[in-house]
Amino acid sequence: MSIQEEIKKRRTFAIISHPDAGKTTITEQLLYFGGEIREAGTVKGKKSGTFAKSDWMDIEKQRGISVTSSVMQFDYAGKRVNILDTPGHEDFSEDTYRTLMAVDAAVMVVDSAKGIEAQTKKLFEVVKHRGIPVFTFINKLDRDGREPLELLEELEEVLGIASFPMNWPIGMGKAFEGLYDLHNNRLELYKGENRFADLEEGAKLFANNPFYEQVLDDIELLQEAGNEFSEEAILSGELTPVFFGSALTNFGVQTFLDTFLEFAPEPHGHKTKEGQMIDPLEKDFSGFVFKIQANMDPRHRDRIAFVRIVSGEFVKGMGVNLTRTGKGAKLSNVTQFMAESRENVQNAVAGDIIGVYDTGTYQVGDTLTVGKHKFEFEPLPTFTPELFMKVSPKNVMKQKSFHKGMEQLVQEGAVQLYRNYQTGEYMLGAVGQLQFEVFKHRMEGEYNAEVIMTPMGKKTVRWIKEEDLDQRMSSSRNILAKDRFDQPVFLFENDFALRWFADKYPDVQLEEKM
């Protein structure tokens, strides 16, 4: 098979949702169909000691939430599937945002009882900004939930995206009978020995069933007043195909996977800083680092740089240019993943995600190229933290471990690091409290460095240009600091302090990140 044909087989997507909507469970079921796991372990197994395959970090196993993005790969129905399971917890939005830059489509998991929740909305905005296709899986049909028509309406009103149902539930909760599959013109049955029935058979099976009659009425209404199906609108991110099912009981998941692979796009090109589009089918290898993860194997204190291959083919041992430094690097120790387990990879192509063993060479956002044509891909988004803590080592004798741990975790993007201009104190910035807890837990567990963390509360952060900097601007209402790239930054007590500063120094340009 040619490299071009291999590239066209790739389907790379992320799964996004609000916490507890069932994202990790559906990931497990997809891996089960891909033959990667013998049985799909449900996430509820905290007491039983069985954990979800994609939740591999110690703190994730303890708390049953995903706090890093896992990468998993399998072959199914002639396609090579790359799934990126993103953190559902709201505190981990930065890692999630960056992961969404490395995929060609997104699967949005929605709880049928709760509908669109805050985190789903935030993540959807990032996906919408990229203009990639979104496939919706409305989960937990085995429990009582909201009316399907109401859920579709909410999708359109809250997220502003048109929807098209690919199947329709027959009852729900204890009265759940199955799905009317509009795409394949058949019924998928929840109970009994037969999994599928044709529509004629189904009509006999559900004769006088009030739920089935309601389904027929709903479908008639959708055909008259609903959106038209359009593959073009799906691929441009304007129309989301909607699937109903139950990940926990593995119902409707395989039908979803089959249909998803029918419509999901091949690998996309990516834009450079200059606006040039790099085509996946180009001969020369290129890729970008979208994530760095330390200690995926705690026994070896390792660091892995996750690279999305944008074009061409990776071959083990190849030399690449690191555009940021202008230096060359040899890619010999490269892996592909199944959450925490990994295997050495000899070659991979555009659309694949590879893990490059990193000794401190790479940073998030780095571009790797081969050949004379050197370029940089568009920068990945950074976010503005709201919560801050002072941090210092509990044991002065452990300074070395403290600095190593902090440097590695900050490079991962788990937290942001700032240093007080006047006192030299270290400060950490995060979107939510859980990030600090994970930082503390990992510093102690992975680097044997206990830390003292002192809350500083909420701050309003703005960056300024080096040439505008005057230390006299510092006052009791703000803290002047430097970020880890040595850029000057002000941490204001509140919005009032920010406005006061802006009025006093009208010529100073204050910049806010995402």
Curated annotation (Swiss-Prot):
| SUPFAM superfamilies hit by this protein | EF-G C-terminal domain-like (SSF54980), P-loop containing nucleoside triphosphate hydrolases (SSF52540), Translation proteins (SSF50447)
Of the GO CC terms on this record, one is: cytosol
| Location in or out of the cell | Cytoplasm
From what superkingdom does this record's organism come? Bacteria
First-listed, main subcellular location of the protein, grouped into a coarse class:
cytoplasm
- Molecular functions per Gene Ontology: GTP binding; GTPase activity; translation release factor activity, codon nonspecific; translation release factor activity, codon specific
Q: What's this protein's family per the entry?
A: Belongs to the TRAFAC class translation factor GTPase superfamily. Classic translation factor GTPase family. PrfC subfamily.
Name the UniProt record assigns to this protein: Peptide chain release factor 3
Q: What is the organism field in this record?
A: Streptococcus uberis (strain ATCC BAA-854 / 0140J)
Task: Please state the gene responsible for encoding this protein.
Answer: prfC
